[in-house]
């Protein structure tokens, strides 16, 4: 089953993306480099719980 997750910017801007992840095949926390439009550069986004 795919669960919804929130990818939060590590730049401290408060920007986030939402996506889904298969917890059976990827049990660890997800870290992806994506574009932060507030900081206007690519930064690391870390997985947090979607409330």
Swiss-Prot record:
Gene Ontology biological-process annotations: translation
GO cellular component: cytosolic large ribosomal subunit
MF (Gene Ontology): structural constituent of ribosome
Entry's transmembrane regions: none
PROSITE patterns: RIBOSOMAL_L33 (PS00582)
Biased composition (Polar residues): 10-20
Ranges where the record places region Disordered: 1-21
Keywords: Ribonucleoprotein, Ribosomal protein
Pfam family, one: Ribosomal_L33
UniProt record similarity statement: Belongs to the bacterial ribosomal protein bL33 family.
NCBIfam families: PRK00504.1, PRK00595.1, rpmG_bact
Record's protein name: Large ribosomal subunit protein bL33
Gene symbol of the encoding locus: rpmG
